[in-house]
Curated annotation (Swiss-Prot):
Pfam families: Radical_SAM, TRAM, UPF0004. It comes from the Bacteria. It comes from Dehalococcoides mccartyi (strain CBDB1). Transmembrane segments: none annotated. InterPro entries: Elp3/MiaA/NifB-like_rSAM, Methylthiotransferase, Methylthiotransferase_CS, Methylthiotransferase_N, Methylthiotransferase_N_sf, MiaB_methiolase, rSAM, rSAM_horseshoe. Its main location: cytoplasm. Residues 2-118 form the MTTase N-terminal domain. The keyword Mitochondrion does not apply. Residues 120-351 form the Radical SAM core domain. This is tRNA-2-methylthio-N(6)-dimethylallyladenosine synthase. Residues 346-414 form the TRAM domain. Belongs to the methylthiotransferase family. MiaB subfamily.
Amino acid sequence: MPGYYLWTIGCQMNQAESDRLGRLFELWGYSLADKAEDAELVLVNSCVVREHAENKVVNRLHLLRSLKNKNPKLKIALTGCLVGQDISLIKKKFPFVDYIFGPGSMPDWREIPEGFILPLRPPVSANVTIMQGCNNFCTYCVVPYRRGREKSRSIAEIGCEVAELVRRGSREVVLLGQNVDSYGHDLPEKPCLADLLSALHDITGLLRIRFLTSHPKDISQKLIDAMAHLPKVCRSLSLPVQSGDDTILASMRRGYTNQQYRELVERIKTAMPDISLQTDLIVGFPSENEEQFNQSYKLMADIGYDAIHVAAYSPRPQTVAARDMADDVPVIEKKRRLKLIEDLQKETVGKANAALMDTFAEVLVEGLQKNKWQGRTLGGKLVFLESDLPLEGCLVKVKIFKTSPWSLQAKLVNILES
């Protein structure tokens, strides 16, 4: 049986698409290989959101070219955001790649029989893509140029996929999109994300629903109310701010101010005091000075996120920022600001997690990791526990006995649902 190998980098949407492609390969008679050297087909699912990620993809492709020189029968496939809209350019740059197709352009749910390419035994927490593309065109972001405009799947289609995943063993779904808060605006019925959450909430056997990524300007009160009143919807929200300074936010075309963002967070916390918030932040954006960076730092400190995904700005081809704005913050200064935010996150999250010592939590167990069961709380915190019982897929009550900024250690109290 021929083998295939998947190399994936980037967001959870990339991972979801790789999972789907892997299932297709298996239906075509391939088996998963342990490494690229043992495969007849290698798929690279790429990301170019950051320069560092793009460099990794290019390096991987050149390694595969060397492998192909040794084994001319090897077939290489490339997808993801490196491909973008103009495949001919990629073919010229990487002529040794055999198959090239854009992100999300593989056969999808609407073109194949129901459940045809879902895994026979899906993970406890399964990714489900609900929409592709983005209409926002933030000045630093290449995604709209690579994934195109927003295109939503219908509630009925998504519901069928989720129901089938649950039937096969999943207990949680993570709804994915570049901007899930604008879900449905392109559909005839004009449903919104809150409508989708309500529809999925009724699926028997589904224990939890998560979603990402959100855009602060598109979060409605209806969505906040749905999160607050639907028990299966996790108290976890990714709320990328990108900067805490109004001038930088305007340069980024984010569509909100520092104060508007703070007011949104206040509304969310009023509705859900136990909400876990995560954010994305860019440091060293063109023209960002020390005072402007301090506005971002203060916002991070004031809100107290459970996770801050911080990155140093790197210009991305095709974007307005790369074309019209000088990348004028020195690399050494970007690194300094990056470390300050990382240190703040470690301190903030460490204190928040320490406050959970000796408390109880409900954890959905996803699987084994280094001989310990691994799962997440309703707020998305990573928890490890030891038990000889078969806990995969179980919802359990635990007592936390050890904390760190990155995870919690807990003891099993009892099984709530198996």
